[in-house]
């Protein structure tokens, strides 16, 4: 695997403005952060840059707003926590409030990089997307991988090149969109992939199963179908039932939240 530029490759950062693409897509409940792991995971990169004298501005998406400002997806709760964890570090508003983010609009890229001297990508979970904040800045600014992204790439590279057989990957999590980069990176290297967690329901829906009111990424069903139709061996849960009214177990096709059994 070709080495990717590291933070050290950016040279002297004293007084330089650095745009850091982070993955602060954290779960919220009533405007409160439920799990701050992703924010804390970005701190090694942020603090390294600050220690080197850089002026750091972070940028991230949060949820799936429809290309316009939506208070439900504001970065304000994240900004409040980040100000405590890394004082002086700025955070842009939700990138997806601008339709140019998901369409990779060159005009939005130009707006995004204006005034910055360097770019760091530390958003591994979003790096498979051809979005403006991911693929645009490296065309205009000296760029490097953050500590988190570099570590993920190193681990994946090691798994793919030094795997012992049989090599079976077990992947979970809530969203296919968060794991698609890992899945696609492993497809040609593993003997099988076992899908669990909430994202399994998107794969089940791709197979034509009813998933009731369970977590479902409708816009990822076609992607799940493509993966299932590939030459890779992918296993998804088959022992499912649904919780009906009053918590009773029923037929998944009748609705309710589907649960994996066993």
PLM regions and their residue ranges:
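Active-site loop-to-helix "anion-binding N-cap" substructures in soluble metabolic enzymes
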Residues: 1-262
């Amino acid at each position: 695997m070709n080495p990717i530029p590291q933070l050290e490759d950016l040279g002297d950062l004293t007084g330089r403005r650095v745009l850091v693409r982070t993955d602060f897509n954290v779960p919220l409940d009533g405007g409160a952060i439920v799990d701050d792991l992703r924010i804390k995971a970005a701190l090694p990169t942020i603090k390294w840059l600050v220690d080197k004298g850089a002026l750091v501005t972070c940028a991230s998406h949060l949820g799936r707003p429809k290309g316009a400002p939506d208070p439900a997806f504001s970065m304000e709760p994240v900004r409040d926590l980040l100000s405590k964890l890394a004082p002086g570090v700025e955070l842009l508003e939700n990138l997806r409030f601008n339709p140019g983010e998901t369409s990779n609009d060159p005009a939005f890229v130009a707006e995004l990089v204006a005034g910055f001297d360097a770019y760091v990508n530390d958003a591994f979970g979003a790096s498979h997307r051809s979005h403006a904040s991911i693929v645009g800045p490296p065309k205009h600014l000296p760029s490097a991988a953050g500590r988190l992204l570099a570590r993920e790439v190193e681990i994946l590279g090691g798994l793919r090149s030094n795997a012992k057989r049989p090599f079976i990957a077990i992947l979970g999590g809530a969203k296919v969109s968060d794991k698609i980069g890992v899945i696609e990176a492993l497809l040609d290297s593993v003997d099988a992939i076992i899908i669990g967690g909430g994202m399994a329901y998107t794969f089940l829906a791709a197979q034509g199963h009813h998933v009731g009111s369970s977590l479902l990424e409708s816009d990822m069903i076609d992607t799940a179908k493509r993966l299932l139709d590939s030459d890779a061996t992918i296993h998804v849960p088959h022992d499912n039932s649904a919780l009906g009214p009053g918590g009773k177990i029923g037929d998944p096709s009748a609705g309710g939240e589907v649960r994996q059994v066993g």
